[in-house]
């Protein structure tokens, strides 16, 4: 089984989303010692945001500007990693009601017609069916219910874009209210880690 582990939290060792994705992957490895894990830290790797030059780059990169060619190859490799994965673990903190720009840059490299989706007479069709996505979702406030739920452009976006790719099995391990005091932060992390340890969310694609 192939597992793709993605981190996008910018707080390094202080990042709760990184703590949770590490726990998820550790649980997967405990349950499936044969799992092959590929790790991408989208912050330290400094993936470039999408440009017109990237989109227009030819399939054959011979003669292309070396910096552009390197960037395009990186994007293609990330797409290949995604397509090869059975389970994708994504650390996705909420920043300003949405996802980190680093994570959006990664998703932009995945959204390739003919690879993760295609257009048909009946409408778009996802081509990445059969995968499982587990998202470690962290938020400073509470956005899963109540009036603030309308501000959620994080989980809603991720469910939509992975669904567009054909992935219907998307689970969220959520830690909310992390900026509402030490007790609430400790409680939210403990509840998320309990969810991971109980394993229901980790019923994996194989």
From Swiss-Prot:
It catalyses: 2 a quinone + NADH + H(+) = 2 a 1,4-benzosemiquinone + NAD(+); N,N-dimethyl-1,4-phenylenediamine + anthranilate + 2 NAD(+) = 2-(4-dimethylaminophenyl)diazenylbenzoate + 2 NADH + 2 H(+). Binds 1 FMN per subunit. Pfam families: Flavodoxin_2. It comes from the Bacteria. Its cofactor is FMN. GO terms for molecular function: electron transfer activity; FMN binding; oxidoreductase activity, acting on NAD(P)H as acceptor; oxidoreductase activity, acting on NAD(P)H, quinone or similar compound as acceptor. FMN binds at residues 15-17, 94-97, 138-141. Keywords: Flavoprotein, FMN, NAD, Oxidoreductase. Belongs to the azoreductase type 1 family. Quinone reductase that provides resistance to thiol-specific stress caused by electrophilic quinones. This is FMN-dependent NADH:quinone oxidoreductase. It comes from Sinorhizobium fredii (strain NBRC 101917 / NGR234). The gene is azoR.
């Amino acid at each position: 089984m192939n597992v793709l582990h993605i981190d996008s939290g910018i707080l390094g060792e202080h990042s709760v989303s990184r703590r949770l994705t590490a726990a998820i992957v550790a649980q997967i490895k405990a349950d499936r010692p044969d799992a092959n894990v590929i790790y991408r830290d989208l912050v330290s790797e400094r993936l470039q945001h999408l440009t017109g030059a990237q989109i227009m780059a030819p399939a054959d990169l011979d003669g292309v500007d070396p910096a552009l060619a390197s960037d395009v190859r990186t994007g293609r490799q990330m797409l290949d990693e995604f397509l090869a994965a059975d389970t994708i673990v994504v650390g996705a903190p909420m920043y300003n009601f949405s996802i980190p720009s680093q994570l959006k840059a990664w998703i932009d490299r995945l959204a390739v017609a003919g690879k993760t989706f295609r257009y048909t007479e009946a409408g778009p069709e996802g081509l990445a069916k059969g995968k499982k996505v587990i998202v470690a979702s962290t938020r400073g406030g509470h956005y899963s219910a109540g009036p603030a739920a309308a501000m959620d452009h994080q989980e809603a976006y991720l469910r939509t874009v992975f669904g567009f790719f054909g992935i219907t099995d998307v689970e969220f391990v959520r830690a909310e209210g992390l900026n509402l005091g030490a007790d609430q932060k400790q409680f939210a992390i403990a509840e998320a880690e309990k969810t991971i340890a109980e394993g229901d969310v980790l019923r994996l694609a194989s």
